[in-house]
Amino acid sequence: MTSPKDNQTAKPVCFQDVILRLQSYWAAQGCAVLQPYDMEVGAGTFHPATTLRSLGARPWAAAYVQPSRRPTDGRYGENPNRLQHYYQYQVIIKPSPPNLQELYLGSLAAIGLDPMIHDVRFVEDDWESPTLGAWGLGWEVWCDGMEVSQFTYFQQVGGHDCRPVSGELTYGLERLAMYVLGVEHVMDMPFNPPGSPIPLSYGDVFRQAEREYSRWNFEQADTGMLLQHFKDAEAECDRILTAAETDSAGRRIPMAHPAYDQAIKASHLFNLLDARGVISVTERQAYIGRVRALAKRCADLFVTTEAATLQAEDAA
């Protein structure tokens, strides 16, 4: 691993520069730089590179950008820092290295936030994801009084204890970049370098989509169809999980990942139904419980499959 001090550079000039610097920094620390998961998720944690790979004994180190959707947070592109579609940067390392906090501070320096100059504080705030049956001990990270990241040591995912414990970092990219670039409204933030042949702001790229999706999320999404799709995803997840573990050629191939895709779909459909206002307080808890049950069963299968794979490797 390289020293965080090697990455102390001048401040970025645009949103994509912040992302590129984080990618370069964590690649230099030995993380596999992955691509976003190709499904609608509410947070970077839902990526199987975090949720599933935090389970079991195999070492793991990955970093990636994840587009995330929270339909209820839509504000038609008018709120300065609240969006229904936004980006997170996710880092997951298992087992968690003893110097993870130092590495994190080095990542801030890499994007121009020198911890020796800025007031960086770790405010105790344990993390929980009810739909994933996951929780961890951790902190919100504040820089000069503004939350910029979440720092978590995973204790449990899908109802399974994390052994070894994974260290997870989540950066809110828009909020962090706005702070680094000194921008008051997310839509005014330069997306690419201002000196580019075609300079684009964040608003140039996303404002119209934010307006349209806000209307669709709150007013136009077909609730009857969404309810049926939720049932379909739930049923398909169950079908995959209960399918025979051997394929037509007699190979043992349980399907935790395809099943987990359906759990992700169910979670996003629940979020859309919540935005449409058709789920009561009582029903909300029941829906969360249904998604959590799916995620737990996917985790069960992943853990069982990995244990069998490791046993086979040891015997070979």
UniProtKB/Swiss-Prot annotation:
Gene3D superfamilies: Bira Bifunctional Protein, Domain 2, Class II aaRS and biotin synthetases, domain 2
Localization of this protein: Cytoplasm
One of the protein's GO biological processes: glycyl-tRNA aminoacylation
Cellular component GO terms, alphabetical: cytosol
Keyword Cytoplasm: yes
Catalytic activity: tRNA(Gly) + glycine + ATP = glycyl-tRNA(Gly) + AMP + diphosphate
An example Gene Ontology molecular-function term: ATP binding
Claim: Ligase is one of the keywords in the record: yes
InterPro entries in UniProt: aa-tRNA-synth_II/BPL/LPL, Gly-tRNA-synth_heterodimer, Gly-tRNA_ligase_asu
One Pfam family matching this protein: tRNA-synt_2e
UniProt protein name: Glycine--tRNA ligase alpha subunit
Gene: glyQ
